Each structure stands twice: as structure tokens, then as C-alpha cells.
Curated annotation (Swiss-Prot):
Chain's role: Together with its co-chaperonin GroES, plays an essential role in assisting protein folding. The GroEL-GroES system forms a nano-cage that allows encapsulation of the non-native substrate proteins and provides a physical environment optimized to promote and accelerate protein folding.
Organism domain of life: Bacteria
Database matches in PROSITE patterns: CHAPERONINS_CPN60
Top-level taxonomy: Bacteria, Pseudomonadati, Pseudomonadota, Betaproteobacteria, Burkholderiales
Chain positions recorded as ATP binding sites: 30-33, 51, 87-91, 415, 478-480, 494
Name recorded for this polypeptide: Chaperonin GroEL
Keyword Transport: no
Protein location: Cytoplasm
Length: 546
């Protein structure tokens, strides 16, 4: 086991604070509408340019192990805030640095770190209560656009795209971000339910221009087994042919003579059909087939429920107004399912989301809810170069998280004003003078986001903070244009969840740093420089070769 270095007291804390400052100073240059970019080196390809706090934080590793511990703890603040609220990572880092900086003065003066921590916790709890009172619901498309724009570093076109997407697919809908093919941002709305499986044979195509198969008013046969024998399918094919309507078959797989017969019937115009593999794998495939069945008003042909292909009637088949099948996607529009059944299914999936342990499972379940309840919107990000594309895409994703957070917990005035207004209404007392000091640490740190925004805009922070404190309510300073006024009216809004998460996470990690009194790190081994190779002995004469 490698030797360890153990450092105590002020020396340990001083090293940690150095690490905190290196990371926080790199992150905080990005704060506010006039924040600067940070360029991140890549081992191959072009460097990445970003204004996203957590992206900068994740890149930083310091050579000094003790400093690095401090930096990694603040990195945790940014990461946790990003996970909880999707934005506010820079604000959280700035708050953490301010709490650590103020707190270290009191620790050095001999105050009890544990009492300081209790005071910090009391102040944070009181502030969170006040933020909830200040917050107002975010309901209008305009407010959603403003929140998105502020989060995307004052890019109003991004805010408008996100608001438009939310309006189209609803608050439950899935909004995904993809690389675009042009210079402009585009928004694609997929109505109805879409899943990522296409036609099994190009012979099903009936729209050569779009290379898709379009079925109007079709029946839908859902089966959780492979279909290879045409005899199994004949009874249902005859019933559908009599009804004179097209048929979409979704099964685990369709192969051999079954697929060949369907293709031949389709080409000859006897029965308009299309065959598609069921989406997903394993248990998720069964669940998604069930979703499609509920949406289309049909039943899944499965042995567990006593249904076989030979026994099935038209009543068990699903129906839809229109289905479009492409090479890779199938879209089911206006299914025949009953609203009450769809709502019950959505409720059931939501209960599963509550119990889901992994992020991947949760994401997949949310996708299923969206496909049943809302729809799917795709924002295609346009840019001139790949570097710009990556930077812009990261901002769009941030803005998307921020708007979701705003819809969830409401909005507060932005630009660091919400924390100052919450601070003005806090009436909390500590049990002793050390706890009182802990409360003062947090109250002082709450000015820091506004100070940093103003500093990055090239103005005098103390003057602006004093003027904002003179005002009331939503009165604040808009750093984008240097105007004082009502932040909500000017469209400078923050999601309450983002501000709350930033403060809670910053205080949590900062309090841990303040209560640290010992650090243990591996001793860096000094590797001796490699000496030159000794002269190699001469090779003996080689015997004569035969």
C-alpha cells in the first residue's frame, strides 16, 4: 500500500480553499449575459468552447492532490445541481466559493465549525421557504420562452423554439435535441405515437417520393411472437380483406413464407399490408406492445392471455386513422383507444417512474408516458461549424432542463435578485453566537451571484448591489443592457427550482469543507530518472553457416 500524507488544521483547509478557488474562478467567468467563454482542450480534434459551468468544472483536475480534493468537492456542487435542476451550475459554484471564503475567516478566528454548519443549515432552510413564497407559476408560452432564453445565455431564438415545442407536445411530451443539417434551428413535431422500427421489406413502400408506406384507416395486429408460418395468419388476413381495409402487423419478427406472402399480396393489390418488428427488447417490448394496444384499442396476441392468431377476430385488432412507416420509424396517428384506458395506463407508468431506481429506466418510462399522453418534438440545432454546434447544443439542453424546472416549481426574478429578496424577509436566530455567525455567512454569500454577474459585465459590483437593495420586489439590474427595473417585466427569470438547488447544494458541500480538520492523500513518488543503458557486450563470432 502506498504511503499516505496526513495534514491537519489550517494547513489542510488552506490547501482545500486554494483548490476551491481555482475551480470556482474558472467557472464563474461564464456567469450572466456578459459572461465569457471557456476553451477546453481535447486530446484529438478541435477544442470545445463552452459557457456551461458544469462542463468547465468536469474538465478540471489539479496536480496538487490536496488542492484537487477541494476542487473535486466543488465539482460535486455543480454536478449535483445539474442533475437536480439541469441548470444553475455556475450560480451554485459561486455560492459555494462565497460560503467557504466567508466561513474560513470565522474558523480561523476560533469559532466552532459544527455550530457554523448548524447556522448555515438554518439560514438555507429559511431561504428555501422564502423562495417558495416569492415563486409564481410559469404558465404562459412567453414566460417559458424567457426562462429558456436566459438559461441559453440570452439566446432568445432558443427560448422561442423550446416554448413552441412545449406548446405543441404539452408539458408531458418528450422534447429531444439533435444535430441539424442547416444553419438555422428547426423544430419537428411528431404527432401521435412514434417508435423506432421501420418496414421489414422495401416492397411495402407505397409513397416512392418519401420512401414510406402510408396506411389510411388500417387495422393493427399486435403479436409478441415470431410469425413465420402463413397458415397462422390466413384467418385474420381473410377477415381484413373482406373489410376492405389495410393491415399493419407488429410482431417480434415476421420471416419466411409469412413475409413473402404479405409482400406478394401487397404488390398485387389484393391486400394492402405492412409488417414491422415490435419496438424494444425483453420485458420492455411487451410493455410497449401493450402501450400500442391501449392507444389503438386492440389487444396483444399472447399465449398468456389465451389469444392465438387462429382465433383472433377483427374486434381484437387495433385501429388508427393513419399510420406512416419509414425505413427506421413508424408513426401511429389518432389511435382508436379509449381516453379512460390511456389515462389509466399513463397513471400506471407514472407510478413505475416513482419507483424506478436507475436514470435509464426512468428516462425510458418517461418516453412511454410522452408517447401516450403528448407527443414528441425534436429541436434540430443549426450551426456553421461542428465546434459551434456542440456549444449551442449544450446550451439548448441546459435551457430545456431549466424550462422543465420552471414549469415544475415556478419562476422567480432572475439576475441574483430572488436571493436578495428572500434574504430581506428571513427572520432566523441561532442558539449561540457561532450559529449566528453561520447565518451571517449565508446572508453575505447570497449577494455573490449578483456581484459576479455585474463584474462580468464590467460594472462596479458594490454600487449595483446597493442600488438593488434599495428597491423592492422584482426590482433588479439587467446586466444585458445595463438597465434597472422590474426583472419579470424585462423577461429576466430564473426557475425557482434552479435557485433553490444551487443554494442547497452549495451550502451542503461548503459546510463539509468548513468542518474538515484533517486530509489524507497519497505521497507523490519521486521516480528516479532512468540512467543510460550500459554498453552491451560484444556478440560472439557466429559459427560458419552450412
Amino acid at each position: 500500500m502506498a504511503a499516505k500524507e496526513v495534514i491537519f488544521g489550517d494547513a489542510a483547509r488552506a490547501k482545500m480553499v486554494e483548490g476551491v478557488n481555482v475551480l470556482a474562478n474558472a467557472v464563474k467567468v461564464t456567469l450572466g449575459p456578459k459572461g465569457r467563454n471557456v476553451v477546453l482542450e481535447r486530446s484529438f480534434g478541435a477544442p470545445t468552447v463552452t459557457k456551461d459551468g458544469v462542463s468547465v468544472a468536469k474538465e478540471i483536475e489539479l496536480k496538487d492532490k490536496l488542492q484537487n480534493m477541494g476542487a473535486q468537492l466543488v465539482k460535486e456542487v455543480a454536478s449535483r445541481t445539474s442533475d437536480n435542476a439541469g441548470d444553475g451550475t455556475t450560480t451554485a459554484t459561486v455560492l459555494a466559493q462565497a460560503i467557504v471564503r466567508e466561513g474560513m475567516k470565522y474558523v480561523a478566528a476560533g469559532m466552532n465549525p459544527m455550530d457554523l454548519k448548524r447556522g448555515i443549515d438554518k439560514a438555507v432552510a429559511a431561504t428555501v421557504e422564502q423562495l417558495a413564497l416569492i415563486a409564481k407559476p410559469c404558465t404562459t408560452t412567453k414566460e417559458i420562452a424567457q426562462v429558456g432564453a436566459i438559461s441559453a445565455n440570452s439566446d432568445y431564438s432558443i427560448g422561442e423554439r423550446i416554448a413552441e415545442a412545449m406548446e405543441k407536445v404539452g408539458k408531458e411530451g418528450v422534447i429531444t435535441v439533435e444535430d441539424g443539417k442547416s444553419l438555422n434551428d428547426e423544430l419537428d413535431i411528431v404527432e401521435g405515437m412514434q417508435f423506432d422500427r421501420g418496414y421489414l421489406s422495401p416492397y411495402f413502400i407505397n409513397n416512392p417520393e418519401k420512401q414510406t408506406a402510408i396506411l389510411e384507416n388500417p387495422f393493427i395486429l399486435l403479436c409478441d411472437k415470431k410469425i413465420s408460418n402463413i397458415r397462422d395468419l390466413l384467418p385474420v388476413l381473410e377477415q381484413v380483406a373482406k373489410a376492405g381495409r389495410p393491415l399493419l402487423i407488429i410482431a417480434e419478427d415476421i420471416e419466411g413464407e409469412a413475409l413473402a406472402t404479405l409482400v406478394v399480396n401487397n404488390i398485387r393489390g389484393i391486400l394492402k399490408t405492412c409488417a414491422v418488428k415490435a419496438p424494444g427488447f425483453g420485458d420492455r417490448r411487451k410493455a410497449m406492445l401493450e402501450d400500442i394496444a391501449i392507444l389503438s384499442g386492440g389487444q396483444v396476441v399472447a399465449e398468456e392471455v389465451g389469444l392465438t392468431l387462429e382465433k383472433i377476430t377483427l374486434e381484437e385488432l387495433g385501429q388508427a386513422k393513419r399510420i406512416e412507416i419509414g425505413k427506421e420509424n413508424t408513426t401511429l396517428i389518432d389511435g382508436n383507444g379509449q381516453a379512460i384506458n390511456i389515462e389509466a395506463r399513463v397513471k400506471q407508468i407514472r407510478a413505475q417512474i416513482e419507483e424506478a431506481t436507475s436514470d435509464y429506466d426512468r428516462e425510458k418510462l418517461q418516453e412511454r408516458v410522452a408517447k401516450l399522453a403528448g407527443g414528441v418534438a425534436v429541436i434540430k440545432v443549426g450551426a456553421a461549424t461542428e465546434v459551434e454546434m456542440k456549444e449551442k447544443k449544450a446550451r439548448v439542453e441546459d435551457a430545456l432542463h431549466a424550462t422543465r424546472a420552471a414549469v415544475e416549481e415556478g419562476i422567480v426574478p432572475g439576475g441574483g435578485v430572488a436571493l436578495l429578496r428572500a434574504r430581506a424577509n428571513i427572520n432566523v436566530k441561532g442558539d449561540n453566537s457561532d450559529q449566528e455567525a453561520g447565518i451571517r455567512i449565508v446572508l453575505r454569500a447570497m449577494e455573490e451571484p449578483l456581484r459576479m454577474i455585474v463584474q462580468n459585465a464590467g460594472e462596479e459590483a458594490s454600487v449595483v448591489v446597493a442600488k438593488v437593495l434599495e428597491g423592492k420586489g422584482n426590482f433588479g439590474y439587467n446586466a444585458a443592457n445595463g438597465i434597472y427595473g422590474d426583472m419579470v417585466e424585462m423577461g429576466v427569470l430564473d426557475p425557482a427550482k434552479v435557485t433553490r438547488s444551487a443554494l442547497q447544494n452549495a451550502a451542503s458541500i461548503a459546510a463539509l469543507l468548513l468542518t474538515t480538520d484533517c486530509m489524507v492523500a497519497e505521497v507523490a513518488e519521486e521516480k528516479p530518472a532512468g540512467g543510460d543503458m550500459g554498453g552491451m557486450g560484444g556478440m560472439g563470432g557466429m559459427g560458419g553457416m552450412m
